[in-house]
Amino acid sequence: MVSIDKYEIFLDFDFKNLIYKGYEKIYLSTDNEVVLDSVGLNIVSVKTEGKSVPFKISDSQIFIQTGKFDGVLEIEFEGKVKERGLVGIYKAPYDHSYIITTQFESVHAREFIPCIDHPAFKARFKLSVKVDKDLDVISNMPIEDVREEGDKKIVTFQETPRMSTYLLYLGIGKFEEIKDKLGEVDIIVATVPGRISKGKFALDVAKKVIEYYEDYFGIKYQLPKEHLIAIPEFAFGAMENWGAITFRETALLADESSSVQQKMRVASVVAHELAHQWFGDLVTMKWWDDLWLNESFATFMSHKAIAELYKEWDFWGTFINSETSGALFRDSLTTTHPIEAHVTSPEEIEQLFDDISYGKGASILRMIEAYLGDEDFRKGIQIYLNTYKYSNATGSDFWNSLEKGSGKPVSEIVKDWITKDGYPVVYVSVNGSKINLEQERFYLKGNGKNAVYKVPLTLEVNGRKITYLLEKEKDSIDIGSDIKSIKVNIDRTGFYRVYYNDLSLVFNSKLSHLDKWGLFNDYFNFFLAGRVNYTTYESIAKQFMKDDNYLVVDELVSELYYLWRVNRDKYKLLYEVLPYQVKRFSKRKDELSRRTYSYLLSTFAFVDEKFASGLAVAFEKYDTLDPNVKEAVAIAYAVTYGEDAYDELLNKYRSEKFDEEKTRLLYGLLSFREPYLVVNTMSLALTGEIKRQDVARILPYASYNPYSRLALWKWLKTHMEFLRSIYAGTAILGRTLRSVIPFLGLNNAEVVEYFTTNRFPEMEVEIKSGLEILDSLRRII
């Protein structure tokens, strides 16, 4: 048994040549030999008390023959900074320069230093870094000392509290900063030079959110400072390194020239990562099986915080439209997994970072909070954090804490939801005063192995609210009087779908915008799964065609646009909805309406060439346009002018400094009707003109373009190994292929053949998912 108290690390960097020398002291005790994780590092020597200790090296570990030992292990090693990958320690270019940065979750600290790279092996870290004098250095803790040594300097940081290896951070380069203070805590936004002007919004959000969490959790933020760092090349949205949170630039930077969507995204991601400072950093899961504990809770809490602090954004609407919706779709596939999933290998761990660990888990937490009540739920959270701070915990520890806080049998209720995969569809039929209920597991492919869940139903019958725990496959409720109206799963707090035998009783109910969203989303998925025909789905869509709520309109247009992309000659209801809703939302000034207007405009510009030609003229004044319409104008310009517009859009893309602006123009560059222009745009990724981080994000968008799918497929097949090298060590490319395969394969049998005959072990699950979705779409094409 090994116990580690502290890592004392000294790193000497050659910034220009992207190499470093490391000297590490590990304070530990062990009953036997020490096994450290180490990948890609050159181990020069291992000593104790100045004497060499024998060791052996495998591909991923060092076996150090200490025998029983209590003391300090001294390791000298050498490392390299990656130039292509986006995990471990890597180079992040910007303009004509770069920074060195790190990304260690889940198992990449071992590529930086020899360590026990396991979340349960918490330790203190004391870090010193030798760099060129003109470079800045950021880590988890404040700087304790700076000492000059020739043309270099040694920067020493304060010691961290006990924490897991994956939360360690180091950034080297040139940074600009803005600061604020909350009590004794420094809150700092850092960017590469020339970007800090867009940091103030995130700084303000962070201060409000930390204050909110300190109150909600009943525990102060534990470190002296909190850095929020915009990284110019970053694989994920953000990473919760304790005291030094990293973000891709589009997840942190926003100002008055940003769209509503951009500001909402920044607020959401900042709140998510700050929630981790308590839930993940202060208290950490024992092993990756319980990753959902970190991610579900941060997802849930970020929406809770923003819903409270920015009420005008209706963030629970955003929650169901993104988190719940994505999780319901992912969990309807046969390739899904339980929230609590057993994993051992790095590949398995990476595949857990998905809609189940984030969205489903967060949706279950929302369901449990609704069942327990706000205060009892909060009390349980506080018990959990106070019991396990600076330590590790399991899912059982979490549910037990909620039981202590509420006095209710939480573990018993949630067991089905976290240990079983999938979820039910509840069939609701009415006979006089009687409600007949039946449940079965919902599959996108139509059918499969059944399961029975404990479903905490919420109903409103004849205007009266009822709660009922459905524990059997079939059950019934008699309310004692004839039923005139009914709705089930009020405000979409439950993680299940509802099928009604008589929809007129639903439309007799008073439906909130969340209820309408749920009904519409359910029946769209019933159509995809072959449970209802298009006529039934279309009749519901027509009920909502003139609805004036942003969430309902977003969902309506999103579903109809999805069908248009499957077969634009068959599914044309979109053309009836868009003119009416674009006109209506163009007159509204509130932020949610402006966001919806932006989406409507972009969709209309892509699907309708006549509308696009009218909008394209606005490109002349692109720089002065409302940020909410810029993307639509770029798309319209590409659709209208084709090849003649390409160079102008490309030059505009190249001249923009901020990623938010570049992304808008990139969507324009992928909207051409001419396939070779879309391929030319994708090929910018090969030269670095499109950031490595963005390739996976734009591939699905490109695949939605029905005019260029065959050409895009040839490009993807040709450059598959390049893409794999960019995202090595992550599951990002796999998730991208899950979205891309269904559209590229609609009319191209080669796609299925390619992915069934070629093996990609790190993406196997998501490729199977994509093929399953493709089967579903082929039924409706």
UniProtKB/Swiss-Prot annotation:
Bound cofactor: record note: Binds 1 zinc ion per subunit.
SUPFAM superfamilies associated with the record: Leukotriene A4 hydrolase N-terminal domain, Metalloproteases ('zincins'), catalytic domain
Binding site for Zn(2+): 272, 276, 295
Active site: 273
Pfam families for this protein: ERAP1_C (PF11838), Peptidase_M1 (PF01433), Peptidase_M1_N (PF17900)
Cell location: Cytoplasm
Single GO BP term: peptide catabolic process
Entry EC no(s): 3.4.11.-
Any one GO molecular-function label of the UniProt entry: zinc ion binding
Any one GO cellular component localisation term in the record: cytoplasm
Superkingdom of the organism of origin: Archaea
Keyword match Cell membrane: no
Binding residue positions for substrate: 105, 237-241
Site (described: Transition state stabilizer): 358
Alphabetical keyword list: Aminopeptidase, Cytoplasm, Hydrolase, Metal-binding, Metalloprotease, Protease, Zinc
Cofactor(s) the record lists: Zn(2+)
Family statement drawn from the similarity comment of this UniProt entry: Belongs to the peptidase M1 family.
Official protein name in the record: Probable aminopeptidase 2
Provenance organism: Sulfurisphaera tokodaii (strain DSM 16993 / JCM 10545 / NBRC 100140 / 7) (Sulfolobus tokodaii)
Gene: ape2
